[in-house]
Amino acid sequence: MFRIGIVGAGAIGKEIARAIDNGTVPAKLEAIYDRDTAEATSFAASLKSKPRVLPLEELVEASNFVVEAAAQSAVREVAIAALSRSRSVMIMSVGALADKELLETIRTMAKEHCCSIYLPSGAIGGLDAVKAASICKIDSVTITTRKPRDGLRGAPFIVRNNIDVDSMDEPTEIFSGPAAVAIKEFPANVNVAASLSLVGIGFERTLVRVVVDPTIKRNIHEISVRGEFGELHTVVENVPARSNPKTSFLAALSAIATLRQVCEPLKIGT
């Protein structure tokens, strides 16, 4: 049985932990780590499995599968700690992998230590189709992210440019550019663009549009892909996570589904 250690006790980390704790994922929740030890301890105590709250190094030693659900800034430390000890790792903060050096480092480590790196689809649909389409030529990939004010409030791009989202009373596009830039400007909002870039045409050629839309209550991701295979258009209207409006509930469900697939012998999907 997999012994899973979760790094990060935020909205997504907690949803994943609950899914393991209630048996949705057939594994053991071994340990939790968060910079806020008090929060992690309180949350762990609320679970029936009573996982231990451990420092990162001890969590990795105690587990045989590690989940990063913290932040882009934590990915390097968590992934290297896990892979160096031959632990497979699932990365939720996929935007960190826009760093080519980091991506190549962890790929090499995974090969050397005979383990795997898992990147869930997140809050978008159609990733399997894009992965299949990438076998031939893809001409263009565009993702348009529409979020209510609270879903984008505080993003570095908004703060640096003094954008007042509260003054917007109609849908307003505030950013259009390559995924490589979008991921840095909106690190808590467009991780889906990173997953899409990795399976498609890369971070520089994937176009990201960000729209503040005060008329909606959901996080909407629209994807358009054109290539030799034909055309793909998907729209997903996501309910925000209960404790973090910047995160979609589907992102947590995607992580849970990935863990279930890791634990099960039957693998479905491209």
From Swiss-Prot:
NAD(+) binds at residues 123, 191. The gene is nadX. Pathway: Cofactor biosynthesis; NAD(+) biosynthesis; iminoaspartate from L-aspartate (dehydrogenase route): step 1/1. This is L-aspartate dehydrogenase. The keyword Cell wall biogenesis/degradation does not apply. It catalyses: L-aspartate + NADP(+) + H2O = oxaloacetate + NH4(+) + NADPH + H(+); L-aspartate + NAD(+) + H2O = oxaloacetate + NH4(+) + NADH + H(+). Pfam families: Asp_DH_C, NAD_binding_3. HAMAP family: NadX. Belongs to the L-aspartate dehydrogenase family. It comes from Methanocella arvoryzae (strain DSM 22066 / NBRC 105507 / MRE50). Keywords: NAD, NADP, Oxidoreductase, Pyridine nucleotide biosynthesis.
